[in-house]
């Protein structure tokens, strides 16, 4: 395991008119790609730096240098807009999660509450999306014991932040993610777009609309 954040790559082989074609799927967290952490949130002005970072990491992984235009125009197959909400007033993430878990989502979603050993996450599952609410600091504490217990992947990169954040007590970090999985789901979520590429979707208003 590298001591830095790297994208996950999957090569898909398909056949078109009897000929094989290959498509590289690239999965990554945009803030982790730039900052090794998703406590910091990106703005539209970060796009150029993000594409440059992605270009360099892909070169490191596969030995091929994709152009920045290729990366900017890459089709989006999965999209996870998210938001960190910081509480400094003794508001407890657990209280918020308990309230959310009591809401009636049944008319729209199937609600499933998943408890991990020393913390909680609420998942709202639908046919075309997945919504996750969780206590980010509790999730990091779980990752410190075992990454398998944590909801976030690659949490080991952020473990050093736990001690730093303790200085800001009573800090609580509530994370909210909406996960559109599959290109059809992304298109349904943003029907106003003509194309669903990395560049066209990296917009604040689109992320806010998804949340």
Regions found by a protein language model. Give the residues of each.
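Structured, helix-rich domain cores that form ligand/interaction pockets
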Residues: 1-211
